[in-house]
């Protein structure tokens, strides 16, 4: 299968080379965590001398005998080489029960530069501070961006054609090996179902999967809608899936912990405060939505909004839903001193739609940049200080 260099992630790990932290690569199942680790190992071999690489892949039967934390610890210590820079890489670390005891002990010795990956459901961002006593840095990996999709399919097709494909195929690159749409969607659906019906059920000892499945399908079908556990529980109960807001709230948290969804909270622009009531949930990848729902309710405005949200997170922004009086700004994004207000739409060719998207932005009185991202199929242009971007071209930017 073809591979590409995911330069953004590789550069980030290279920046952390030699720092006194445990480097933890996280992300949804099949997002490319192991491939990234392998690419970094190749980089080290090509660019450094006098190094010792200790690599353990718990998916490989060769390491079956050290799937016990004492044995893992002893194996690493036995392979340490004095006088060299010792790198420790452990892939699928969760397959060794109590792995954190071995990793913490090895970290405390100060002899190893440590990198680990694990299943999304068993190496959760929320758990890291509890698992590891030392400093750690999380490198979060998303499915392929549109830019990476174009890099993978480096051929004569134009950006518009590739964008239409990416809207339904998404960024789970393992699906690209299959020639038919049926096989591709089956692959994506199996990744999704493994997380929802196996990983999370096992992680949290859930009594059954029905409520979790229905909840996940509901959120998938309602991306970009303001949602609360109370509202969702009422709708699920009305559709014969009896539950309550407490269970729904917990299950939403589990789905977000596993990076299936990302929760985006609201921000009152005028009052400059964060709002606790209602939030939006965005799916980690557009391909999952198509694999689960097909063309049913294929609302491109919502799909594009989801794609923009994930891309903003991928680019390192803090993302919020903006509230201004009774109007909504799709995204208020911040990174350091940078702030941008963003509206997302499908088609803004009609004057009515264009004015509707512009109106909330024009009411904002500060001087931060404002933009509309839509399927314009035109180069970037401006209106009343608002930048108008074609979504395919915007996604191709750095």
Please give the residue ranges for each predicted region.
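Hydrophobic anchor at the beta1->P-loop junction of P-loop NTPases
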Residues: 25
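Conserved lysine of the Walker
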Residues: 33
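Hydrophobic positions on the alpha1 helix immediately C-terminal to the Walker A/P-loop
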Residues: 36, 40
């Amino acid at each position: 299968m073809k591979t590409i260099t995911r330069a953004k992630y590789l550069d980030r790990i290279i920046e952390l080379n030699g720092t006194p932290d445990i480097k933890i690569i996280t992300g949804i199942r099949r997002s490319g965590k192991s491939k990234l680790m392998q690419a970094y190992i190749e980089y080290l071999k090509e660019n450094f001398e006098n190094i010792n690489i200790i690599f353990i892949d718990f998916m490989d039967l060769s390491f079956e005998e050290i799937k016990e934390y004492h044995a893992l610890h002893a194996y690493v210590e036995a392979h340490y080489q004095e006088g060299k820079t010792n790198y420790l890489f452990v892939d699928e670390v969760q397959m060794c029960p109590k792995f954190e005891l071995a990793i913490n002990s090895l970290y405390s010795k100060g002899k190893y530069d440590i990198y680990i990956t694990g299943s999304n459901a068993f190496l959760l961002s929320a758990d890291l501070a509890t698992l590891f006593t030392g400093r750690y840095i999380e490198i979060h990996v998303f499915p392929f961006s549109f830019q990476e999709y174009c890099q993978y399919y480096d051929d004569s097709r134009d950006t518009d054609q590739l964008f239409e494909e990416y809207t339904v195929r998404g960024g789970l690159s393992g699906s690209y090996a299959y020639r038919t749409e049926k096989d591709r969607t089956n692959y994506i659906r199996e990744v999704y179902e493994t997380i929802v019906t196996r990983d999370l059920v096992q992680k949290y000892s859930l009594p059954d999967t029905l409520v979790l499945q229905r909840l996940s399908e509901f959120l998938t079908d309602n991306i970009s809608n303001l949602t609360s556990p109370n509202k969702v529980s009422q709708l699920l109960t009305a559709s014969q899936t009896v539950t309550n807001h407490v269970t729904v709230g917990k299950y939403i948290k589990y789905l977000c912990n596993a990076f299936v969804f990302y929760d985006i909270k609201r921000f009152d622009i005028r009052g400059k405060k964060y709002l606790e009531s209602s939030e939006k949930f965005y799916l980690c990848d557009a391909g999952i939505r198509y694999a689960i729902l097909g063309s049913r309710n294929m609302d491109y405005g919502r799909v594009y909004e989801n794609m923009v949200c994930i891309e903003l997170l991928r680019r390192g922004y803090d993302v919020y839903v903006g509230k201004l009086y009774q109007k909504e700004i799709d995204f208020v994004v911040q990174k350091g001193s940078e702030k941008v207000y963003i509206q997302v739409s499908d088609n803004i060719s009609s004057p009515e739609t264009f004015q509707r998207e512009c109106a909330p932005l024009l009411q904002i009185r500060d001087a931060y940049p404002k933009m509309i991202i839509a399927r314009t199929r035109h180069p970037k242009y401006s209106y009343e200080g608002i930048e108008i971007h074609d979504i395919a071209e915007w996604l191709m930017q750095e």
